[in-house]
A protein has these predicted regions:
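Charge-rich (acidic/polar
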Residues: 1-277
Length: 277
């Protein structure tokens, strides 16, 4: 690939050479962004902005933030990719020889570089939200959150249950208003829970890969393989408890027939319940 790019640059005209650096960065992004493993690491900020089809004056206002992201994310992606290529053999060797400490050092560095890519993306989104007209900020922020962190911001079954409940026929006005009030309260609590889950994701997601390597080493040596305590698990559990509580509150407002029309509104089984524990 490098040889091809060198040959290509050699035949470009002076005018074409001026266009080469941004094109080269785009080629790097297209190749390396999809390889991200962390939430938020694969977000194509420029592509996301392009999808919104903003007016020219809006795009001009966003141009400084997009240029900064273009340069910074390309540098971060190259640093991440170079480290992975240079240390792939070291990582494989550490797994064969059970040299866990060396392997963990490599994974920690990979995690830090991946977090840098994510930070560049998150920062760009924050800057764009500040630069957008007020009537466009909420929509863009919501789309970026769902695209970057679907594990956190995608609609839940409880969200869908409330939306479907509001569409039920023959709801008396008092019940309709009560459902709307509960939905507002739930949205506030879920927003707080999502913030805590986002913080836990930033703290603990790259650690999960290290924990997996530790469990692999423990299994190979005949030791126990218990899952390490993870802040993401605790934050997800707290969010599920909120969802389940509001699902019960919704059930209390509806008749049995209405509950059946909404699919039963049963709480989601825990991992232990699915295993029969």
């Amino acid at each position: 690939r490098d040889e091809f790019e060198t040959d290509l640059v050699a035949v470009l005209t002076e005018e074409q050479l001026e266009l080469w650096p941004p094109l080269q960065r785009q080629l790097i992004r297209d190749r390396l962004l999809p390889r991200g493993r962390l939430s938020g690491e694969t977000l194509d900020v420029m592509g996301l902005v392009d999808e919104q089809e903003y007016a020219d004056e809006v795009l001009l206002a966003l141009l400084p933030a997009l240029k900064t992201w273009d340069v910074n994310v390309t540098d971060a992606l190259m640093a991440r990719d170079n480290q992975m290529v240079e240390n792939q053999g070291v990582l494989m060797s550490s797994m064969r020889t059970m040299d866990v400490s060396t392997g963990i050092d490599v994974l920690k560095m990979q995690g830090r570089l991946a977090e840098t890519v994510r930070f560049v993306n998150d920062t760009a989104v924050e800057q764009i939200v500040l630069l957008l007209p007020a009537d466009k900020t909420n929509q863009f922020k919501a789309i970026a959150q769902q695209r970057s962190y679907p594990r956190i911001y995608r609609a839940t079954r409880t969200d869908r249950a409330y939306e479907d409940a509001l569409e039920l026929e023959e709801l008396i006005p008092e019940t309709l208003q009560a459902i709307m009030n509960l939905q507002d309260s739930m949205d506030d609590e879920i927003a707080m829970a999502n913030g805590q889950l986002l913080s836990a994701t930033h703290r603990g997601e790259s650690q999960e890969q290290i924990d997996r390597m530790n469990r692999f080493a423990q299994r190979m040596s005949g030791g126990t393989t218990e899952r390490a305590d993870n802040p993401i698990d605790h934050a997800e559990k707290a969010k599920r408890e909120i969802e389940d509580r509001y699902l019960e509150l919704l059930r209390d407002l509806l008749t049995e027939e209405q509950i059946e029309e909404l699919g039963g509104l049963k709480k989601r089984e825990t991992r232990e319940e699915r295993r029969g524990g």
